[in-house]
Amino acid sequence: VPKIPVKVVTFDEIVEWSRRLADKIRESGWQPDVVVAIARGGYVPARLLCDWLGVGDLLSIQVVHWPSAAEVAEKAYVKYPVNVDLSGKKVLIVDDIVDTGDSVELAKKSIEECCSPKEVRTAALQVITSVAKFMPDYYAIEVKEWVWFAYQWNAVEDAAGFIMKIVRETGKTEWCLDELLMTHLDWYGNEYVEKRFGYILYALDMLNRRGLVKVKKCRAD
């Protein structure tokens, strides 16, 4: 069993989940006038929902919550708010996944306070119900146990974050490549390493160039 369970998400799954989410919104009888993506994870799902729902107006708000892969900041905050007049508009806020729910809750409060919308509802592709303190109005998938979902749009960022998590927790900055890859298997599982192998190597090269990790090709003991 990996130390950190990771589910690698395909783009086909994203399209299917966004379609499922759009169906739930339509079935509720509610139609948004504007979609607001929570940057950065909400960009792709929000754009897909615009397509499924026939919405032409797409904005974004950035809420900072996760500093790196499988790490959590002490407190989420709005980094770049929306600052436009949305009077009379029905607004749908979209994120990729709701973990604690802090990001979605903050985005909703920010838009309600600064933009004067008629109504604000929230949506996410997935909700981890075991840890969520704020539930969105709509979601496609319920996740009952915590898993790190590795989406297509932050593959390099995840890979770099996972590498640096190993470095921080082991206190070791110099690695044999084979040894580091075996550690990845133990920590993150076969699926992640097999499907994201190229991204892991890319992130290793990037971190090596920045002087954060030193990797050499040698056989691990």
Residues of each region from the PLM?
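PRPP-associated nucleotide enzymes
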Residues: V1-D221
